[in-house]
């Protein structure tokens, strides 16, 4: 599975309300750019802005997972 498909799958299973908005704000793009990126089938087809917002979105999801793991260790 390539990185683009992985992000699409994670969006369907892991994201919380506000994650897309937060990623768009951090990347400095509109939600339309995010939606456009999800419609692409190959990672090579992504523009720089689309790539940036998807990577930012992935970072948000990864940070949440890391935070949950840290809390589990503390408890």
Tell where the protein language model's regions lie, with residue ranges.
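Short alpha-helical "recognition helix" segments of helix-turn-helix
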Residues: 22-24
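Recognition helix of helix-turn-helix/homeodomain-like DNA-binding domains
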Residues: 30-45
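Helix-turn-helix/homeodomain-like alpha-helical modules used for DNA recognition
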Residues: 66-75
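Short Lys/Arg-enriched helix C-cap and helix-to-coil transition segments
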Residues: 45-67
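Short, amphipathic alpha-helical "recognition" segments used to contact nucleic acids or chromatin
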Residues: 1-17
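Short linear motifs centered on Gly/Pro in flexible linkers and helix caps
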Residues: 15, 40-44, 58
